[in-house]
Amino acid sequence: MISVLKICTKDQKGLIYRISDVIFKYHINIVKNDEFVGEGMFFFRALLEGEFDKEAFIGTLEAMLGQEALIELCEKRKKDIVVFATKESHCLGDLLIKHYSNELEANIKAVISNHNSLKDLVEKFEIPYHFISAENLDRKEQENQILKCLEQYKFDYLVLAKYMRILSPDFVRHFEGKIINIHHSFLPAFIGANPYKQAFERGVKIIGATAHFVNNNLDEGPIITQAVSPVNHEFTW
């Protein structure tokens, strides 16, 4: 079995050696590890292979690093996600195809949309589709229906794939750190609606896409990953 070990603690000399020594003493194999230091803090992430007493292992690390250290150990697995969409199919379609071909490092448990236009597409992939209309409902009423729908699923993240509605502060707080948005610009540039139009009008030479966690500031949550593509004067928006 592969486990993921994550450690965050104050930087000091010899941490890599001391952590590796604990791992060795528990007869665990390190498949991969990464570490870096920033602003006086040490961050460590490793993939561990082997069977071992996890509670005893964590206890040994805590005794060695101190109670202020943040230590997390979990099984490596695909994350379970619920996707929110509206009417546009390209983002959702890409996720569905990658999920179908096993390229997506996640399991799509369901799709929720405020329109019914993508139902046939989603059900072709044998994934549950929930149409929760926003018509004649205020935002709180619609989000309460979404919350009720989500109760039937166990999931790690909610993924917004061109979900063209702004979530309420209460909803975001309810799932703090668990909502991921895909925004079609190289954030922090071109926040909000029509980022391609904004980029075109500014005459930029690269455009991008950003996956980020959602907070209550529009398109300003912590960035997870980004990609860019070059453009020139021949492009339009």
Stretches found by the model and what they are:
Residues M1-K10:
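Short glycine-/aliphatic-rich beta-strand segments at the starts of folded cytosolic domains
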Residues I2, I19, C74-R77:
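FNR-like FAD-binding dehydrogenase module
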Residues I2, I30, A106-I108:
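A broad structural signal for short, well-ordered beta-strand segments within beta-sheet-rich domains
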Residues K10-V31:
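Short amphipathic alpha-helix segments
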Residues F36-W237:
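One-carbon transfer enzymes
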